[in-house]
Amino acid sequence: NEKPAFLIHTGDICYEPGLTIHNQVVNAQTMDCPVYYCIGNHDLVKGNYGEELYESLYGPTWYSFDIGNVHYVVTPIDHGDNPTNYTQKDVYNWLKNDLALIKKDQALILFNHDLFTPNDSFVFKADDDHLLDFRSFNTKAQIYGHMHYNYVRNQNGIYTICTGTLDKGGIDHSPSSFREIKVDANDNITTQLRYAFIEPQIAIVSPMNNQTAAACTITEDQLPVSVNTYYSQAKTSHVSYILSDSENNQEIAKGDLASRTD
């Protein structure tokens, strides 16, 4: 209900059952926005070739699209449970032609199930004679999922971003979550996790057990009121309060609380 520009699954949709069910329940019609997928190593299943089922359900394993001033590129993982019908040379040839057509200074964000490089080089390598240096473009980030943990790293100006599994958390024991990524008008990237499966909840932090928050300046006739709120499906827009006498339920004060965090 926050109208994202698109949703993307970064791979390991997972084997035949996962590939089939995701196609039915997580798509543009059910999510009310564009939905994209990357192919993961566990999506290369038995068939005439590893990506055959994926292609029949989701389409090409590599593709690109533009939103605003950002060019988004999805490429397939180069290894998996079953052999692929494509090679890194095939991907290189397409990628070279695709990037040759982007606008000058257009921001570039890359998706692949696996991390391209653990160091700062950011070179796509088919072989020693076929290399693409992503640093020669306005590359902002590579977003991946193969490690199944929650991790964000700035690799000398290019972010690498990984997110754990939505329905069961990460290998690093992080809780179930999904990731929100924002790209502003200047192509700057910010990201935060949104914890999954949490129904609307509110907890009074202050006053509590005859104690009040100390991290604020108040006068004798003031009472600091602090609450925590959370809901997986939406951010809190505002919190209103009514303070009443516990003996006669008479209203003492009411108003709206000021947001101190996001």
Where are these regions (language model features)?
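Long, low-complexity serine/threonine/glycine- and acidic-rich segments characteristic of extracellular
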Residues: 226-230, 234-262
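Histidine-centered catalytic micro-motifs
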Residues: 110-115, 140-150
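Extended active-site neighborhood of metal-dependent phosphoesterases/phosphodiesterases
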Residues: 19-104, 128-141, 149-184
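Short acidic, glycine-rich surface-loop motifs adjacent to enzyme active sites
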Residues: 10, 101-119
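N-terminal active-site segment of His-dependent metallophosphoesterases
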Residues: 1-21
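Binuclear metal-dependent phosphoesterase catalytic core
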Residues: 158-231, 237
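Residue-level marker for buried hydrophobic side chains located in beta-strands
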Residues: 7-9, 37, 110, 143
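Active-site glycine-centered loops adjacent to acidic/histidine catalytic or metal-binding residues
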Residues: 11-12, 40-41, 113, 145-146
